[in-house]
Amino acid sequence: MFVGTSLLALAALAHDVLALPNAAQSPSAIRIRKSTATNTTGVFGPDSTIWAEDTPYFPVADYVAPPSNCEIDQLERHGARYPKKSPTKKIKSALKKLQKVTITETSMQFISNFTYDLGEDDLTPYGALQSYDAGVEAYQRYTSLVEANGLPFVRASSSQRVVDSAGNWTAGFAAASNSVYTPVLSVIISEDGNDTLNDGSCAALSDSDSPGDQEAAWIDIYTVNITDYLNAGAPGAGLDNTDTQYLIELCPFVTVANSERSEWCDLFSSLDAFPGFEYYGDLDKYYGTGWGQGDLGPAQGIGYTNELLARLTNTAVNDSTSTDTTLDSNPATFPLNRTFYADFTHDDLLIAVYSAMGLFPTPALNYSSPDDQETSAWRVSEMTPFAARMVVERMSCSDESGSGDGEYVRVLVNQAVQPMPSCGSDDNDLCALDAFVESQAFARNIGMLPRYTGQHWAE
């Protein structure tokens, strides 16, 4: 049995204050950017792969098995959830404006009879199932690494939605093994203190549900025509562009609440809203805990990265950022002898870890237009969808593998193997373990050394 309960989706302030475009300017055509995903099948229709961080999980690429023996570290986001408290108020406010007037546009008629009955923060039944299915998949994929005395070691950040996701994952893992192997959630890390599975350790980053400068500027560009359409179809509603942004959120949230595509999705798909909506999510994460936040955002991922390095090298954790030294110094709460580790977290922490590790290197996003970002690696829909997962595989390879004798590491995000030029990855996108550890200088030196930018080390 699996359970459902809540979430968190943080947004942080931008590192630099940028000159904003004129909000009244006419929007340029918003093109659908090219995806690098080899699998773009959406669970709830083709556009459900571009709902930013509200995207239901989909494998970005087909999984390719590693050459041989592995140790697995998996960092997974909780499953799909209901809106948080603050967005809920804003969604209801915008919806009230529409429902107090007579709607004349045919495509919007359903709104008059729409009842908002979503919960707050908790996992939806679909979100609970996502984590359960992930546990089933993990057992099926890595069966050879599991034995009675070597079950996955599971941790979770203390938010209830994250704890429940971890429990659902262990239930799926056990069910797939016919209850031969029954991993348990061993450690719940309090978000009130040092927690490497949560990005709340830095007071200088705002915990905000409102758009930052870059995102707000983009809202006033991409929603202009959509807002005009909605106001024309509901005379007197008086919607503004921010209202429109929150109304678009109803598509993914109602969909994952009911496990079927919402009428809101069809409305906003007909208005070509989702390419712009996706780019809003990209900006939010990029200037939150991602590359656009200088070193402050990625620094939130240092603690977890150092824990990962400790596991890969079977050495004590060396960190003075967000680790809980009491937990990490105790073999019962931070063992170093397991072949499978599974940690459960939030989307913003995943973004911080990606950025700290040098994954998805991306120059500054143009917050007035996505047109020059068509081939950008920074696509939140493919990085942190609901139930997103980063898997780090440590393996022993022989000369026959094509990578030479020795220990290697590869990193997968939602099944897509990540290129890692910072550690000299080979044609199989494998890095020698020593080279991988050396490449993580930003984390190993507690953010005092530069991060890899994708082409060189940042100054």
Residue ranges and their predicted role:
Residues 1-25:
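Fungal secretory targeting signals
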Residues 20-153, 157-341, 345-459:
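Signature for phosphate-centric chemistry
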